């Protein structure tokens, strides 16, 4: 019980979302995921994250209105523009650089818990009808993208957010 308590306003799960005109992820020179218009999402899973946190973050990302409407306002979501998502697992997002020059990754979730949450994030987006591609958890990946805008957002699921 006590291990699940979190400090007030503590960040739980985080996604770095970049609006892209296209993006792909390669492993050993082979493309394993690619999209055209949509989002490249670098997903960080924190120790103690829950399925509920994951679903809420995926819903938030899927509903982001950062595509231009006919008046040039950022008013359209992925579904409105037939966009896709390329999700790349990235434990380094949980890195803490406050002390010293070497990041601490102690807050990153262990792979045996993080992988199912990564898969749930993708599944939640797909259930909304959003095409999803992904990188591979634990792999050494090369990610290429053209950031459109540029628009880059950090979407965080904390105890008191959304």
Task: Enumerate the language-model features and the residues they cover.
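N-terminal intrinsically disordered, cationic/polar leader segments
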Residues: 18-27, 48
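Short, Lys/Arg-enriched N-terminal segments with co-localized hydrophobic residues
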Residues: 1-12
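Compact, glycine-rich, soluble single-domain proteins
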Residues: 30-82, 92-123, 133
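A short beta-strand-loop-alpha-helix capping motif that often carries His-Thr
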Residues: 75-92, 138-148
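Residue-level signal for inorganic ion chemistry
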Residues: 57, 88, 151
């Amino acid at each position: 019980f006590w291990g699940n308590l979190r400090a007030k306003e503590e960040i739980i799960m985080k996604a770095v979302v970049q609006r892209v005109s296209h993006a792909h992820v390669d492993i050993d020179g082979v493309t394993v995921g690619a999209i055209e218009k949509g989002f490249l999402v670098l997903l960080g899973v924190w120790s103690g994250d829950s399925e509920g946190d994951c679903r809420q973050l995926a819903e938030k990302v899927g509903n982001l209105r950062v595509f231009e409407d006919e008046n040039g306002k950022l008013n359209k979501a992925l579904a409105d523009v037939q966009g896709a998502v390329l999700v790349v697992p990235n434990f380094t997002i949980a890195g803490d650089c406050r002390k010293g020059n070497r990041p601490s990754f102690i807050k990153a979730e262990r792979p045996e818990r993080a992988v199912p949450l990564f898969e749930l994030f993708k599944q939640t987006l797909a259930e909304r009808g959003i095409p999803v591609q992904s990188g591979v958890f634990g792999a050494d990946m090369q990610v290429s993208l053209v950031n459109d805008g540029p628009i880059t957002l950090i979407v965080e699921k904390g105890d008191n957010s959304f």
